[in-house]
Amino acid sequence: MRDRISDFLEEKHGLSANSKQSYKYDLEQCLDIVGERISDTSLKIYQAQLANLKISAQKRKISGCNQFLYFLYHKGEMDSFDRLESAKQAEKKAEKPEILDLDSFWQGSDFPEGRLLALLILEMGLLPSEILALKVADINLDFQVLRIQKASQQRIVTIPTSLLSELEPLMGQTYLFERTGKAYSRQWAFRQLEAFVKEKGFPALSAQALREQFILRQIENKVDLYEIAKKSGLKTVLTLEKYR
């Protein structure tokens, strides 16, 4: 797929060198996340990654990616023309967030990994990438804390008592979520989470929306915004101001 970017750009006449470079950067970034096997699931993952960008940036990246996807479809390299949702459509879907009744998440499930992923996001505000990178060695159930490491930075997060029994059976592994000692991919996590929330009747509930539920619950409990930012790994409280 990546080697087809140059062919795609050659067919776009009248573009300046800077515009072509911008297209190339956006498409390479898209393929870094989507991978070589483009699917509806991988496109949803990429769409979620764009959600925090300005609408203008989203429109540019979505337009470029959709043009490239159509190019691949037109050349017979894709069976169907799968595309990203327009930024306007995504914006229209945005409504004022409210606290959802997610008590059913604590009940049994045919998707136990998806269930635990959802609970870790909902109860602790962790990102899926942080959860997948989490090693058992970074979890201390006795002190009810876990350590999140990102590059040279780390933060200590308190584990709610309600999650201790969920984590205890996994303490003999290397990673919290693993297969033969290797951490699972983001696409695996996305599929597990998607299957679980569908099972519970919340098909539109993404990892980002679950993290938002964590924030809303913290605010409901009168937790200071700076403390919420610290728990969530946010550098500032600016993104939390809208929830006041």
UniProtKB/Swiss-Prot annotation:
GO biological processes: DNA transposition
Subcellular location: Cytoplasm
Domain Core-binding (CB), first and last residues per copy: 1-73
Keyword tags: Cytoplasm, DNA integration, DNA recombination, DNA-binding
GO MF assignments: DNA binding; tyrosine-based site-specific recombinase activity
UniProt record similarity statement: Belongs to the 'phage' integrase family. XerD-like subfamily.
Protein name, as recorded: Tyrosine recombinase XerD-like
Gene name for this UniProt entry: xerD
